[in-house]
From Swiss-Prot:
The active site is at E249 (proton donor), E361 (nucleophile). It catalyses: Endohydrolysis of (1->4)-beta-D-glucosidic linkages in cellulose, lichenin and cereal beta-D-glucans. One of its GO terms (cellular component) is plasma membrane. This is Endoglucanase. Residues 1-19 form the signal peptide. Keywords: Carbohydrate metabolism, Cell membrane, Cellulose degradation, Glycosidase, Hydrolase, Lipoprotein, Membrane, Palmitate, Polysaccharide degradation, Signal, Zymogen. It is found in: Cell membrane. Belongs to the glycosyl hydrolase 5 (cellulase A) family. The gene is egl. It is an enzyme of class 3 (hydrolase). Residues 20-45 form a propeptide. It comes from Ralstonia solanacearum.
Length: 426
């Protein structure tokens, strides 16, 4: 799906074209971290053989404390040793009885329980804008949100910012070093936001493409995207408040081709000894409603069970809109219950296969039906927190102008949708 629309930037005199936020249009349709003292019950399926969520608890040699008896692991990258810990412990090979990764810096991570969503936040768009002008000019074609703007969302109760950006700007040439200026913008935002206790979800907003060439093709082999992620993971592996989102909305490719690329990228991330949580999308714009459908090829629900994370710390990211074709281009929502309905099959898949999910994009205009649909959707996610880890609204950011889904405040005034989200931020 393509959600392109004109926008107004305060720093730019003319109207510009925004980069497309994503979505999951389906042609078959007609119409932050949790603290060490978290005491929620462990999800039975969350083991090292399925989709666990491990959040960093302590750095090498540091002491830590857990409430009750919890599963803690010690290591780095893909090398770990697990231990059931009651009370206090220390992030050392002596305490865990083994050095799983000799010669590298290690951390201790806590296996997260269920019952409370880990992340609730918003995509702050801007750095992915101007996709027709790559790499483009900063301040004219695209903009990073300011770290200060995140304070508004934090004060509302959000603890996660999803940051869309373009691969081509960060790495203008495949397999080569990152552009210093773009890297500075990216790391500056991430470091400032995570320093306040927020989590940042990195989102290469490229639809599984680089200058229009699909990942897994001869022009953009899997090894090139693996190189990108190896470099990016190295930048942020010491920051446990950074989540690595593999890609925004892969589409129009064999699902098997996307799986191959995703597995290559996961291997590259873990080879950099990065222990961060990784969010993995599916094919077909990673639509929740179409996860088990075959109109785009072999269903995600079949193929993505072949995912292989050597670090055993992944979450599946899906997107879901509420209009007739799930594209997120309409102000109308199908019904007050459509959001929960469209998440149902994916939720069953998560639970049946021992995985966890994150609702990485959803949004709607402000009207009675849509407000009810959003509320029912978020209630559904909350009530299924044994497999759901959280959500991020699409979108906020400085250049949206009158975009119907935007929750960026206008002159300090909340957008109407914020009142719908507010009960789920307590």
């Amino acid at each position: 799906m393509r959600r392109c629309m004109p926008l107004v930037a305060a720093s730019v005199a003319a109207l510009m074209l925004a980069g497309c936020g994503g979505g999951d249009g389906d042609p078959s349709l007609s119409t932050a971290s949790v603290s060490a003292t978290d005491t929620t019950t462990l999800k039975p399926a969350a083991t090292s053989t399925t989709s666990s969520v491990w959040l960093t608890l302590a750095k090498d040699s540091a002491a830590f404390t857990v409430s009750g008896t919890r599963t803690v692991r010690y290591g780095a990258g893909s090398a770990w040793v697990e231990k059931s810990v009651s009370g206090s412990g220390r992030c050392t090979s002596t305490f865990f009885g083994k050095d799983p990764a000799a010669g590298v810096a290690k951390v201790c991570q806590l296996l997260q329980g269920t019952g409370t969503l880990l992340w609730r936040g918003v995509s702050l768009a801007g750095a992915e804008f101007g996709e027709g002008s790559l790499p483009g000019t900063y301040g004219s074609n695209y903009i990073y949100p300011s770290a200060d703007s995140v304070t508004y969302y934090k004060n509302k109760g959000m603890n996660l910012v999803r940051l869309p950006f373009r691969w081509e700007r960060l790495q203008p040439t495949l397999n080569q070093v990152f552009d210093a200026n773009e890297l500075s913008r990216l790391t500056g935002f991430v470091n400032a936001v995570t320093a306040t206790g927020q989590t940042v979800l990195l989102d290469p907003h490229n639809y599984a493409r680089y200058y229009g060439n699909v990942i897994g093709s001869s022009a953009v082999p899997n090894s090139a995207y693996a190189d990108f992620w190896r470099r990016l993971a190295t930048q942020f592996k010491s920051n446990p408040r950074v989540i690595l989102g593999l890609m925004n909305e892969p589409n129009s490719m064999p699902t098997e081709q996307w799986l191959s690329g995703a597995n290559a990228e996961l291997a590259a991330i873990r080879s950099a000894n990065a222990s961060n949580v990784v969010f993995v999308p599916g094919n077909a714009w990673t639509g929740a409603h179409s996860w088990n459908q075959n109109w785009y090829g072999t269903p995600n629900g079949t193929v993505m069970k072949g995912i292989n994370d050597p670090g055993h710390n992944l979450v599946f990211e899906v997107h879901q809109y509420l209009d007739g074709d799930s594209s997120g281009q309409s102000a109308n929502c199908v019904s007050a219950t459509i959001g929960a309905q469209r998440l149902q099959d994916f939720t069953t898949w998560l639970r049946s296969n021992g995985y966890r999910g994150f609702l990485g994009e959803f949004g709607a205009a402000s009207n009675d039906t849509c407000n009810q649909a959003v509320s029912n959707m978020l209630t559904f996610v909350k009530n299924n927190a044994d497999v759901w880890t959280g959500w991020a609204w699409w979108a906020g950011g400085p250049w949206w102008g009158g975009y119907m889904y935007s929750i960026e405040p206008s002159n300090g005034v909340d957008k109407p949708q914020m009142s719908v989200l507010a009960p789920y931020l307590k």
